[in-house]
């Protein structure tokens, strides 16, 4: 007979009650301690349930009940400080359900907790008015003893702290760890708890807000959020989030009603709806409270057999609505870990338990740190943290398509999530979640990012450095200047093609790579060998976080994808024809820079025309699919074929003469150094790109084989063809690894 294993959950919030249901479903013995007299008090405002949490709630059988008392977020609205609409999309809920299987729903915290509690079968395992005062742990593998304020004692194999920001379990874990293993808890865990914002939350009845959906109102150093309650109830949840004058370190005591009233009076005239001010909303409110918004993510969330989850382990800014959903994710992961340990007969194996909890700690630290950073960025933008954020919020983002500017960013918060492995799977949408993907993106370490930036920089500088070290040469190679100029121009076609493709990726929308034209203009002015390394270094920096790979990696504009090849032919027709005819026109070299700049403009104009004529599909079916890949393939293949033909022709005609001149003579010519720098950069970029694909498990191709192919193709076909080929290869690998299957089919292969 198996040795009994008991879990003691401290805290009856979303995390604790969800975990209790999961442990029952998996057949584990547990007890739950809650210090309040009611497991579902009518306190707090609302809870937002996003697809990553909804799918787990569906697995444990409470989602349908939640929906009965919840309001779906069908539309997205954002208002300026003057009350004008800057963003409106009535299809948000429909699109989210299509993509991820579930809409966002909003319900009262009371109803959420009540539904979770009602689902629990063994209600005798729930103990109210049990405030934990002390925890004792023995040697690894021994049981923990938990004492409560009323003198009760509980024994468990694993104690899970889910008792919120002001956690007694966390305090006990720190006390025990500091006593037994000083330094185990990093100082930044204790000093990293900070409150940057304060919120006033409330519930209003018939305040005059439009029914359905949610609304956000932007303002200087503050923002607002409103959401309708159950349809037909007339109830609206609202909140004001305002930035503190200075960040407050540590756990913040509860704030007074006087502080709340001061904020309400200060911002009473703020427009938060059409014809509605904060003062008017407050007059219609039946409940309001003030809370400090504390933020932190602990590096250490367990010691021996004490584990922290939910707001005990991390506290996120609520603007992104991921607090409760992250708690549900953590509960599901704990339940899965215990199931797997039981399957391996390792529940009482101290080493096995430590390893499992370490993996939990590492995974959740990465996940919740990303969520915290994302939420903080959203709040900074909505509250105009600086002039740049204000400009983006009011003048840039509202002009971008909703499916490009918002849905991919929302999706990147949902799709890294797990669900429960050992229960029937939840509903699936068009986008895969992390467990369904071959790729396993993790954040790249700062050291790796810096190392690759240094590597790319050295590659760019290498030819120039060698030139300085080698003996001076008097040869100027006058007969080869036109050859070098032509070769540089052909390489620039491949480089600008890469830039244009990348500029249509949702993951680079708010980055220096959002448009290719500035980079091309800079290259024409300063030189391609000076601009390309800067671009590639920015790309390395932009892709270091997990969110980059959970955002669609393909072109968001099918019209632009279809226009790539025709526009390439149009833009480069004149310099191409003049070159093919061996023209001696002195203005030939002037046509290439013009063509480089014309190409992205033609792509943009063509895509705008195609969208205006409704000649291409639009919306989520394009943004979240790889339907653009066939058009990218044709485009990059054309570049590879033409550039390799130029490479082979020039090598055939001039290779022997160039070899006779020698390295010293070649590197004495500036154009030759430019070519060498670009070639070294392209090889270095290919090396980095294959390493990155291996790092995120997007390919199983060995690095030695991949790097050999890059070097050989660069020598035989030229760097421009090598760049085009490596770019397309990486797109195909990402498409397979992220399971982004086409949602619409290309039309008869015509572009």
Curated annotation (Swiss-Prot):
Active-site positions on this chain: 218
Entries under InterPro entries matching the protein: FAD-bd (IPR002938), FAD/NAD-bd_sf (IPR036188), FAD_mOase_fung (IPR050562)
EC category: oxidoreductase
One Gene Ontology CC term in the entry: membrane
Top-level lineage group: Eukaryota
Lipid bilayer topology: Multi-pass membrane protein
Binding-site positions, FAD: 34, 48, 109, 311, 324
Pfam family, one: FAD_binding_3
Disruption phenotype: Abolishes the production of arthripenoids but leads to the accumulation of a new compound that possesses a sesquiterpenoid chain with adiol group at C12' and C13' position.
The keyword Flavoprotein is annotated on this UniProt entry: yes
Keywords: FAD, Flavoprotein, Membrane, Monooxygenase, Oxidoreductase, Transmembrane, Transmembrane helix
GO BP term, pick one: terpenoid biosynthetic process
EC number from the UniProt entry: 1.-.-.-
GO molecular function: FAD binding; monooxygenase activity
Induction / repression: Expression is induce on medium.
Pathway in which this enzyme or protein is active: Secondary metabolite biosynthesis; terpenoid biosynthesis
Transmembrane segments: 8-28, 446-466, 481-501, 508-528, 563-583, 590-610, 639-659, 663-683, 706-726
Primary localization class, coarse: membrane
Cofactor(s) this protein cannot do without: FAD
Family stated for the protein in its record: Belongs to the paxM FAD-dependent monooxygenase family.
Function of the molecule: FAD-dependent monooxygenase; part of the gene cluster that mediates the biosynthesis of the meroterpenoids arthripenoids. The pathway begins with the HR-PKS atnH that catalyzes two chain-extension steps to form a reduced triketide, which then primes the SAT domain in the NR-PKS atnG to initiate three more cycles of extension to give a linear hexaketide corresponding to the polyketide part of arthripenoids.
Name recorded for this polypeptide: FAD-dependent monooxygenase atnA
Organism, as annotated: Arthrinium sp
Organism lineage: Eukaryota, Fungi, Dikarya, Ascomycota, Pezizomycotina
Gene that this polypeptide is encoded by: atnA
């Amino acid at each position: 007979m198996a040795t009994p294993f008991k879990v003691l959950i401290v805290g009856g919030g979303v995390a604790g009650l969800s975990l209790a249901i999961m442990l029952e479903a998996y057949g584990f013995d547990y007890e739950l301690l809650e210090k309040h007299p009611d497991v579902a008090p009518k306190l707090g405002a609302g809870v937002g349930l996003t697809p990553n949490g909804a799918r787990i709630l569906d697995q444990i059988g409470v989602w349908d009940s939640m929906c009965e008392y919840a309001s779906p977020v069908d539309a997205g609205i954002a208002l300026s400080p003057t009350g004008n609409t800057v963003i409106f999309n009535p299809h948000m809920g429909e699109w989210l359900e299509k993509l991820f299987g579930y809409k966002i729903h909003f319900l009262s915290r009371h109803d959420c907790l009540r539904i979770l509690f009602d689902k629990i079968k063994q209600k005798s395992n729930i103990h109210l008015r049990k405030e934990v005062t002390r925890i004792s742990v023995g040697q690894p593998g021994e049981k923990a003893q938990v004492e409560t304020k009323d003198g009760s004692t509980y024994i468990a194999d694993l104690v899970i702290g889910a008792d919120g920001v002001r956690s007694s379990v966390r305090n006990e874990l720190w006390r025990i760890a500091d006593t037994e293993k000083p330094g185990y808890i990093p100082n930044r865990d204790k000093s990293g708890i900070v409150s940057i914002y304060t919120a006033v939350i409330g519930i209003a009845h018939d305040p005059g807000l439009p029914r359905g959906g949610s609304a956000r109102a932007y303002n200087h150093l503050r923002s607002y959020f409103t959401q309708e309650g159950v349809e037909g109830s007339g109830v609206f949840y609202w909140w004001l989030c305002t930035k503190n004058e200075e960040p407050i370190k540590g756990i913040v005591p509860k704030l007074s009603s006087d502080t709340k009233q001061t904020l309400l009076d200060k911002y009473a005239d703020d427009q938060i709806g059409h014809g509605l001010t904060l003062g008017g909303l407050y007059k219609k409110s039946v409940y309001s409270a003030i809370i400090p918004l504390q933020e932190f993510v602990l590096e250490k969330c367990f010691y021996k057999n004490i584990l922290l989850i939910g707001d005990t382990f991390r506290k996120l800014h609520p603007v992104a609505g991921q607090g409760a959903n992250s708690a549900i994710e953590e509960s599901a992961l704990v339940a899965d870990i215990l199931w797997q340990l039981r399957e391996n007969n390792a529940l009482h194996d101290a080493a096995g338990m430590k390893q499992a909890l370490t993996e939990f700690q590492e995974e959740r630290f990465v996940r919740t740190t990303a969520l915290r950073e994302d939420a903080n960025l959203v709040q900074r933008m909505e509250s105009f943290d600086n002039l740049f954020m204000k400009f983006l919020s009011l003048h840039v983002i509202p002009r971008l398509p909703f499916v490009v500017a918002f849905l991919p960013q929302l999706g990147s918060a949902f799709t890294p999530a797990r669900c429960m492995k050992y229960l029937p799977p939840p509903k699936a949408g068009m986008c895969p979640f992390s467990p369904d993907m071959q790729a396993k993106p993790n954040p790249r370490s700062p050291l790796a990012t810096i190392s690759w930036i240094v590597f790319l920089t050295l590659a760019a500088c290498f030819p120039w450095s060698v030139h300085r070290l080698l003996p001076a040469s008097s040869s100027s190679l006058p007969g080869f200047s036109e050859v070098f100029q032509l070769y540089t121009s052909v390489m620039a076609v491949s480089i600008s093609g890469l830039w244009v493709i990348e500029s249509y990726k949702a993951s680079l929308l708010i980055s220096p790579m959002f448009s290719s034209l500035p980079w091309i203009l800079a290259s024409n002015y300063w030189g391609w060998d000076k601009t390309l390394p800067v671009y590639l270094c920015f790309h390395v920096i932009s892709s270091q976080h997990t969110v980059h790979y959970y955002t669609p990696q393909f072109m968001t504009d099918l019209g632009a994808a279809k226009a790539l090849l025709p526009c390439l032919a149009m833009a480069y027709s004149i310099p191409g024809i003049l070159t093919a005819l061996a023209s001696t026109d002195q203005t030939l070299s002037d046509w290439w820079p013009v063509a480089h700049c014309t190409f992205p403009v033609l792509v943009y104009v063509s895509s705008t025309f195609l969208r205006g004529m409704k000649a291409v599909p639009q919306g989520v079916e394009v943004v979240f699919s790889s339907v653009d890949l066939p058009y990218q393939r044709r485009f990059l293949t054309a570049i590879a074929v033409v550039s390799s033909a130029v490479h082979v022709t020039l090598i055939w005609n001039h290779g022997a003469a160039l070899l006779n001149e020698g390295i010293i003579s070649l590197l004495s010519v500036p154009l030759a150094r430019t070519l060498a720098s670009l070639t070294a950069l392209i090889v270095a970029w290919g090396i980095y790109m294959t390493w990155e694909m291996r790092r995120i498990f997007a390919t199983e191709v060995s690095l030695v084989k991949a790097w050999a192919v890059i070097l050989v193709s660069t020598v035989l076909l030229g760097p421009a063809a090598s760049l085009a080929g490596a770019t397309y290869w990486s797109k195909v690998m990402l498409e397979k690894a992220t399971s982004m299957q086409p949602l619409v089919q290309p039309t008869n292969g015509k572009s």
